[in-house]
């Protein structure tokens, strides 16, 4: 199979359609074919990779997609999470959030997402030993994310630290919810105060039990009290009109001639 990309010919040793096809018969772009081909080669090496992903996306694992997404996007950022992994016989530090951001910058959310969104694909996996066929639906972004997460021990790390990651997600979500509710309550309180009038109720004023009424003084506003944002938002005049300084009145004698 051949595809033209950046004026170079890319050759695929095996037609990707043997394992992956578009759910809605959409055509794959050259970039999508590259991503799918890479993921196909990875998942085809061991059935346990496919089963690990399927347990999570089907809700059969203790790890949920939401927790996995929280770990790479939030928890790892807040805690600067890293660990050592061996690549090419060499141990390197793997900084989770930095690597996650690198993947996002390289692929965008469309092609790197733990959730099954955007273009859907039907994937067929045949076990080389048992010859069992596994078929499931995913997306290009989801396949690419799980390939990265499994290859770089992300899922293994989350398994070992699942409880603390879940607690962090719940606590942070709770605080953000309370903060939002407090902000909304403050806005309502401010709007109520603005609606209160200083004018006396006429029905109350008719009561003989009232000896005196004190009204709060009317607040005076001036142009000097305008906020900086008001001044900044004022549109600048590009040219001046001759009437900017008012209309001047002049007295001139008028002479009318009649033929």
Swiss-Prot record:
Protein name: Uncharacterized protein L507
Coiled coil, from the record: 158-187
Composition bias, Basic and acidic residues: 172-181
Region (Disordered): 172-197, 217-240
Lineage, uppermost ranks: Viruses, Varidnaviria, Bamfordvirae, Nucleocytoviricota, Megaviricetes
Pfam families: DUF7197
Compositionally biased intervals (Low complexity): 182-193, 217-226
Keywords (A to Z) from UniProt: Coiled coil
């Amino acid at each position: 199979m051949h595809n033209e990309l950046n004026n170079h010919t890319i050759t695929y040793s095996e037609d990707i359609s043997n394992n992956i096809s578009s759910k809605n018969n959409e055509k794959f772009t050259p970039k999508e074919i590259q991503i799918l081909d890479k993921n196909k080669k990875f998942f085809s090496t061991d059935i346990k990779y496919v089963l690990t992903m399927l347990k999570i996306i089907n809700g059969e694992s203790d790890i949920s997609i939401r927790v996995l997404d929280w770990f790479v996007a939030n928890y790892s950022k807040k805690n600067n999470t890293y660990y050592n992994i061996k690549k090419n016989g060499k141990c390197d530090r793997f900084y989770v959030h930095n690597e996650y951001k690198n993947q996002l910058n390289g692929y965008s959310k469309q092609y790197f997402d733990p959730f099954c969104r955007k273009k859907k694909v039907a994937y067929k996996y045949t076990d080389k030993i048992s010859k069992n066929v596994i078929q499931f639906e995913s997306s290009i972004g989801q396949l690419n994310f799980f390939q990265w997460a499994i290859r770089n021990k992300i899922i293994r790390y989350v398994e070992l630290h699942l409880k603390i990651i879940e607690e962090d997600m719940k606590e942070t979500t709770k605080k953000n919810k309370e903060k939002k509710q407090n902000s909304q309550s403050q806005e309502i309180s401010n709007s109520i105060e603005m609606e209160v009038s200083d004018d006396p109720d006429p029905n109350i004023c008719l009561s003989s039990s009232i000896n005196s009424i004190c009204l709060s003084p009317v607040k005076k506003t001036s142009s000097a009290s305008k906020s900086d944002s008001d001044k900044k938002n004022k549109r600048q005049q590009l040219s001046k009109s001759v009437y900017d300084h008012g209309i001047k009145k002049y007295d001139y004698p008028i002479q009318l001639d009649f033929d």
